Amino acid sequence: MKLKIAVQMDHISTVSIAGDTSFALSLEAQRRGHQLFHYTPDRLSLRDGKVFARIEEMQVRDEKGSHYSLGEKVRTDLSEMDVVLLRQDPPFDMNYITTTHILERIHPKTLVVNDPAWVRNSPEKIFVTEFADLMPDTLITKDPLEVAAFRKEFGDIIVKPLYGNGGAGIFHLHEADRNLASLLEMFGQLFREPYIVQRYLKDVRKGDKRIILIDGEPVGAINRVPAEHDSRSNMHVGGRAEKTELTEREREICARIGPSLRERGFILVGIDVIGDYMTEINVTSPTGVREVQRFGGADIASLFWDAVEGKRK
């Protein structure tokens, strides 16, 4: 079964192929004989109820410096595609949200992965609060008095943008830190939205585990260890990836959230776990597929396309 697959992503020229999940998914789709097309979100249009994009046929190669070839741009009705991958990186802003509204017009006749309506309605740092008993103590607010009371209760805290990504804008504040008021003032100037405050988890020094789920089932994980003088474990900001296995607690977390992921049409999801606590459910453009395979884990790209092909039969 040959599928026509359009990948909505940041431009293919910008990806780092060693760690890019969109690239890994494209490689596997091509290996299976599917026809790949590429476009960036700014080439997506809605006219008279139809969804169009200026797409280019794409070929990919696992060769640094020569990893892609693109054909001519052709204005195409995306309802002619079998699958559209919603894979541009956050931030989860109005530009991102608008693409989900547009792509919702063709789903599920054209299978959009992940389901655009549920992506829009499941912001990663808010969706996770549906499982409050699996999380560290968490506050979402813009009220400085609430933040001050939260810090008084828990001492060390983490403050971060509600719709940030890649470790940007994350601050670790100690109980006696005098910068809280200044930080909240800065956040108020930079962000219109509330921000998220969480109890600091000392286990982050041992790593922040990214667990990947396909159709609600855990299929692989990596442990991301922060640099010596940083509280952030994201690989974008210097975190180090390590081989890991799932603990009994992590399997319990996955079993709890799996049914909800399947109900929402989330085929590919990445959750973040520190110690015994889940901190995020990533549904927009989860990463980690290549790192898991590099450490001898499952071929998650293959499992992903098994799931997608199963839904197109």
From Swiss-Prot:
Keyword Metal-binding: yes
Pathway(s) per entry: Sulfur metabolism; glutathione biosynthesis; glutathione from L-cysteine and L-glutamate: step 2/2
UniProt domain ATP-grasp: residue ranges: 125-309
GO cellular component: cytoplasm
Pfam families: GSH-S_ATP, GSH-S_N
Positions annotated to bind ATP: 151-207
Catalysed reactions, semicolon-separated: gamma-L-glutamyl-L-cysteine + glycine + ATP = glutathione + ADP + phosphate + H(+)
Gene3D superfamilies: 3.40.50.20, ATP-grasp fold, A domain, ATP-grasp fold, B domain
Keywords: ATP-binding, Glutathione biosynthesis, Ligase, Magnesium, Manganese, Metal-binding, Nucleotide-binding
Cofactor binding: number and manner: Binds 1 Mg(2+) or Mn(2+) ion per subunit.
Binding sites annotated in the UniProt record for Mg(2+): E280, N282
Known cofactor(s): Mg(2+); Mn(2+)
EC number from the UniProt entry: 6.3.2.3
Domain of life of the source: Bacteria
Molecular function terms, GO-annotated: ATP binding; glutathione synthase activity; metal ion binding
NCBIfam families the record matches: glut_syn, PRK05246.1
Family that this chain belongs to: Belongs to the prokaryotic GSH synthase family.
Protein name: Glutathione synthetase
Protein source organism: Mesorhizobium japonicum (strain LMG 29417 / CECT 9101 / MAFF 303099)
Lineage of source species: Bacteria, Pseudomonadati, Pseudomonadota, Alphaproteobacteria, Hyphomicrobiales
